[in-house]
Curated annotation (Swiss-Prot):
Function recorded in the entry: Possible role in ribosomal RNA processing. May function as a substrate receptor for CUL4-DDB1 E3 ubiquitin-protein ligase complex.
CDD domains cross-referenced by the UniProt entry: WD40
Subcellular location, record wording: Nucleus, Nucleolus
Ranges of compositional bias, category Basic and acidic residues: 430-445
Family matches, as InterPro entries: G-protein_beta_WD-40_rep (IPR020472), Sof1 (IPR007287), WD40/YVTN_repeat-like_dom_sf (IPR015943), WD40_repeat_CS (IPR019775), WD40_repeat_dom_sf (IPR036322), WD40_rpt (IPR001680), WD_repeat_DCAF13/WDSOF1 (IPR051733)
Gene, per the UniProt record: wdsof1
Domain of life: Eukaryota
Any single GO CC term annotated in Swiss-Prot or TrEMBL for this entry: nucleolus
Protein name: DDB1- and CUL4-associated factor 13
Species of the source: Dictyostelium discoideum
Pathway: Protein modification; protein ubiquitination
PANTHER family, A to Z: DDB1- AND CUL4-ASSOCIATED FACTOR 13, U3 SMALL NUCLEOLAR RNA U3 SNORNA ASSOCIATED PROTEIN
GO biological process annotation, one example: maturation of SSU-rRNA from tricistronic rRNA transcript (SSU-rRNA, 5.8S rRNA, LSU-rRNA)
Length: 445
């Protein structure tokens, strides 16, 4: 007679330490687990509820400025080093690890309009309304700077923004009518690019195709330049003015625009006739935007005193952050590891937020990491179930934002009803403006 017995090795089954996890033996045959899907649904529901319970996005604030924060920039090599410039001409360096101030300097008379680190991280360049550009040397290893200025570049007009080309000594500034290209070693601009006579408010270098440059103007234009030539390449005219622009760090052809019409637009510069995506949850002018270093999300700061995080392929925001004391948000910034967001507002504070509101901040064991990955998978699997979707997407917002959002939705529904009624009563289909193309007025080459 043949008898089957369970045979196990003593070495494999014996724990070396009392804290070791005992190995569990499972039979993964689906016929033995008829309630596998209901169990996964309950786990997904519990994980979604716990996400909302542990959603504590606010980490802390960086206080010390005596005026509104107008611009911020992150260090290219240090995760915890950030610089900020305020409306009273003060520049401060911050340590994000300890949420403390490294150093401060009175840099300009008037607004600090632009701030950027050089690609090697050893210098910082700032520009202001006092018609000067100043280069500061960072003292290693603390990465602080003293009151001494290495170089001063004088301009004919006030500067509105600045950006540095990657792996080069070239930087660009914007002003009342033109974009100027500078070198560290030259006291005058080596190149002047102009298209029209309106004030250029923002300028940004492409991080991949480093010879490409984008700018936005006060007369609703987005202008693209190629600094290898002495003339602009393309001009996009939009329905309303743009306040800020940002290049995608992973796709050289994707450009995001923060607009006065309360939306964020993503354009493919190879085809500017229509937008790729429209992100439309704000109820006030969008003042600043920034891509995450992964290129998968966009953070935006608005005149409605809220911060929103958008997936690049979704028109709805994933998260909305606000506090009772936070005012108009002039500047937003992702940290280099994509885990945190900085916001600079008119209330003289920089606030630090988690990009994922329920993410733990401590060091995780391998089992904890596996658990979080599993929960993310099952939440993704059941995300379209109405009960889970309601819990996952529900957010509390200020009453003013809620009312404006309600009115905005009612206007949108009324337009849809009007189109439907015209079609039903006249027998003709009215011409409907497409969402992706109605923002574009014209494209000039």
């Amino acid at each position: 007679m043949k008898i089957k017995v369970i045979s196990r090795s003593e070495e494999e089954e014996t724990k070396e330490k009392a804290s070791d996890v005992r190995k569990l033996h499972r039979n993964l045959d689906p016929n033995l687990h008829p309630f596998e899907r209901p169990r996964e649904y309950v786990r997904a529901l519990n994980a979604t509820k716990l996400d909302r319970v542990f959603a504590k996005p606010f980490i802390g604030s960086l206080s010390g400025h005596t005026d509104g924060i107008f611009t911020m920039t992150r260090h290219p090599t240090l995760l915890n080093n950030v610089a900020s410039g305020s409306c009273d001409g003060v520049i401060k360096l911050w340590n994000l690890t300890s949420l403390t101030e490294r150093t401060t300097v009175q840099a300009h008379n008037g607004f600090v309009r632009g701030l950027v680190f050089t690609p090697d991280g050893k210098h910082m360049v700032s520009c202001g309304e006092d018609k000067t550009i100043k280069m500061w040397k960072l003292d290693l290893p603390e990465y602080t700077f003293n009151q001494e200025v290495i170089s001063i570049y004088n301009g004919k007009n006030a500067f509105t923004s600045i950006d540095h080309q990657l792996n080069s000594t070239t930087f660009a500034t914007s002003g009342p009518t033109s974009v100027e290209i500078w070198k560290h070693q030259r006291s005058t601009p080596i190149q002047t690019l102009q298209w029209g006579h309106s004030t250029i408010t923002k300028v940004k270098f492409n991080p991949i195709e480093t010879h490409l440059l984008a700018s936005c103007t006060t007369d609703r234009d987005i202008i693209l330049y190629d600094i290898r030539e002495n003339s602009p390449a393309q001009k996009l005219t939009t329905s309303m003015r743009s306040n800020s622009i940002a290049w995608c760090p992973t796709e050289s052809f994707t450009l995001a625009i923060a607009n006065e019409d309360e939306n964020v637009y993503q354009y493919d510069i190879r085809n500017l006739s229509k937008a790729m995506t429209v992100h439309r949850d704000h109820v006030g002018s969008v003042l600043d935007i920034d891509y995450s270093p992964t290129g998968r999300e966009i953070v935006s700061g608005s005149y409605d005193k809220t911060i929103r995080i958008f997936p690049v392929d979704s028109y709805k925001s994933r998260e909305v952050y606000y506090t009772n004391r936070m005012q108009r948000i002039f500047s937003v910034l992702f940290t280099a590891d994509s885990r945190f967001i900085l916001s600079g507002s008119d209330d003289m504070n920089i606030r630090v937020w988690k990009a994922n509101s329920s993410a733990p901040l401590g060091i995780l064991s391998n089992r904890e990491k596996e658990k979080l990955e599993y929960q993310d998978k099952i939440k993704e699997k059941f995300k379209e179930i109405p009960e889970l979707k309601t819990i996952a997407t529900h957010r509390r917002v200020p009453q003013l934002v809620y009312k404006r959002r309600f009115i905005k939705n009612e206007i949108h529904k009324a337009k849809q009803r009007r189109v439907k009624n015209i079609s039903n009563n006249s027998g003709k289909s009215p011409k409907v403006e497409k969402v992706l193309s109605k923002h574009t007025i014209k494209v000039d080459n």
